[in-house]
Each structure stands twice: as C-alpha cells, then as structure tokens.
C-alpha cells in the first residue's frame, strides 16, 4: 500500500543538499493521473488518500529551507495516451466509477496510427488540453516552482496554444515571487532555444551546446521508480556523467525512486553521499562554470541523443573535460593517472587558443604542482599519492 508513512521531507532535503544538488524536482503528477499535491481539481490526490499529506508542499518547504531551488514535474498531458491501451482490455480504465482518475483515455491503437513525434495527435482534445493548462497553472499558483519540467507531449501541435499561454503565465507569475523568472524544461522541439531549457532523457550531447541544456536520468539502471532487486549507477559513473555534461554547457537532473513507505533505499543514499563528498572537494570546477572552447580531449566519446546513457564506455586517464570560471581553467581527468605525470594535449605551448599557464593545482591537494608546457602538451608532475577514487580536477591559471 502506498502510504508514505515514513516520508521525512526534512531528511530528504538534507540528503539532497549533502549530495551537492542545487535544485530538486519531484514528480507532482506522473502518467497515472495521481496528484502528489493538494489539488483542488481532483479527488485522486496524496492529500485525500494514501499518504494523506501534501507531499509536494511539504518537500517544497524542506528543500527551500536547505537553500535549494525547488521545481515540479508534470506528465499529465500524456495521461490519456499512456492509458489508452486500457480501453482494449478488461481494466479499470473502462469503469465509469474511475473516469475522473483515468480521464478520457483514448484507444489510439484502434482509432489512429500515431504520427511522427511533435506532429499533431488529433485526439488531444481541447478539453484535455485545457485541463492540462488548469492543473499546470494550479501548481504554479500553489507552490511557485523555480522549474517546471514537462515530458515530450507538450510539443504536439494541438497542445501548443495552451503551452504558449502557460509559458506566459508562468514566467510572469514567477517574477512576482522571486528575483528571476522560472525555467521550463522541454524535450525535442517543443519550444525555442531562447524560451526554455532543452532536456534529454537518459542521454547526453556529443558537443558543446551554446544554450543551456539538461540531462535527466535515473540513478537506477532499470527504472524510474522503486523496484525490488534493482541495480544502480556507481558514484564514478554519476560523477563522470556530470563532468561530461557540465563541460558541454549542461546540467544533470538525477532521479531516485523511493519506496512506497517514503524511505530512500540505502544503496541510493550511499551513491548520493559519495557524489556529494567529491563535490565538496571539486565543486569549484562544476558550479557556476562555463565551457571552454572545446569540451575536452581523449579517446572516449559520447553520442548525442536520448535513451543511451548506460552505453557510455569507461573513461580513461587520457580523457579530460574542461570548464572555465573567470580567468581560471579547470581540466578534469576522468580516469586515475597510473604514473607520476599526466599530460593534457590541448594545452600544449603551440596549440591555437591554449592558455599560457602560470600555475597548476590539484583540487584537494595543498600547494601547486610542477608543470612544463611543451609543444606536445601540458606535462603535470603528480604527487606520490593522488587522493580520491574518482575524477581529478586541476585548477589552471
């Protein structure tokens, strides 16, 4: 039974802060149509059944108390699409008693062949579109989220009139409650580059993108929610992925799946603590940085696109990713160096646009390192013991 009887929003928020997160985006409503917030537009909510509490509202207070940004995700616009197959089998979707929960689930398998992504699914009725607009606006009015994450169906042509209205309402309303306008996450071609932030689900980009973007993925290798006998990404995988994304002007939104009782699996907490420990030492190479003229160097490449993040090869000591902040350049080595020297080819004395190096520091190590900027690269002498288990960030000035 879903009761979330052990849900502790304060503990959750503290864990997220300790992990190094800067913003938290819980699911306000997923494709099942169940609102995890205090909605006045539905009886199928966490306030009126199950946990019998405003999960989103309670978490919003706790997250903001930790100094983090708070957002929400809504997947309601896909609701009648995901549940449409229920029309073809004996299921609760066909029971009029649950019509308010399942909505006008449309049997598109029988009645229409889906058109290519972002074209018009004509069965998205104006009534369903207006319902999405009302519920999305309700989230804005109740919780003033800094981020609104939407799944891909907001890109359907039949939804766009409501999307335009929502974006104007959200951006204008958010300015009343904060110093800056909120952000909308979109997928594919639902919005323009300058109007919102592109999101790639379980994927990355192969090159620097001039506009900010985001990867959303799950710490689980198999699922977005909690399942038994799950397997999880390692701290090294998460850190390497984060570094690669940031070097290309992106952010990482990492999903975790809590149990139905409101607790977060210990294995997940351990990964988050490890990532947070790395960021406590190396965070200056991540937070508030911008890409360099190239994202990095090395043999390991990442293909652009969604739904392939677990296909990435293991990074080596020859793989570096670059970030900048002011006059400081950071080179993050994704594999542990095997000897007493590491070489960054992009910073050779003859390379076009390469910096003239005055000092090199390994974050987490006192003092500066000896280096030689030569025609074949920047040669850095390493300490006898290189601390840490994961990526190694060099501060270069």
PLM feature spans:
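Mature catalytic domains of secreted/periplasmic carbohydrate-active enzymes
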Residues: 1-397
